[in-house]
Amino acid sequence: DDASSFIKDHTCVSEAETPLLSVRNLKVHFPVRQGLLQRVVGHVKAVDGIDFDVYRGQTLGLVGESGCGKTTAGRAILQLQKSTAGEVMFDGSAVSSFSRRQMRPLRQEMQIIFQDPFGSMNPRMTIQAAIIEPMKLQRIGSSRTDRIDRAVALLEEVGMLPEHLRRYPHEFSGGQRQRICIARSLAVEPQFIICDESVSVLDVSVQAQVLNLL
């Protein structure tokens, strides 16, 4: 699997430090079915046995051509995609065996910024509602005013304006929507973020700004 090619930063890690995320032998295989009875005749090995650790404050990049399994690996780590085999440990917990209910409290700690910003946003929600909703679910902020103030600050951090809170997703360009999605992911103060080519649609100057923020 090409998703097993990595780029790591040069963060100094103590040998005694425990990884925030540990992935061992992660596999995601999709069955290939044929015939009227839809019998399984083979498997597509989207992810086939990857291993890596990520420590607090560290950045790791999965590098590979389109369709090699990078997105599938990210979704499997967050339990958004069922894995075929392997173990995912997050902050000491074996999340690969967690149910949806058990994963719910961890959604604050583990976030993803999807490659398609429009598909990951509710077109009927204003930007304010989209950013504030996860804060309400995770009980971040003591009041609605606190949450709105935080939403404004996050928008400004990603190069947007406070008045954009009252608008809807269709009123923005692809790059602007992606910046909004990044602000939404940061709203719950996660420990770990998966970025699925999250800055690929942004201008170079904005890319640098957002990467520094992350």
Task: Tell where the protein language model's regions lie, with residue ranges.
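Conserved ABC ATPase signature
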Residues: 168-172, 176
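Conserved ABC transporter NBD signature motif
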Residues: 86-94
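A short, proline-enriched helix->beta-strand linker immediately N-terminal to the Walker B motif
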Residues: 187-191, 207
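ABC ATPase NBD coupling module
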Residues: 36-41, 82, 95-111, 137, ...
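Hydrophobic anchor residue at the start of the ABC signature
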Residues: 182, 194, 210
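Conserved ABC ATPase "signature" region
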Residues: 94, 145-163
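Conserved signature/switch motifs of ABC ATPase nucleotide-binding domains
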Residues: 170, 188, 200, 212
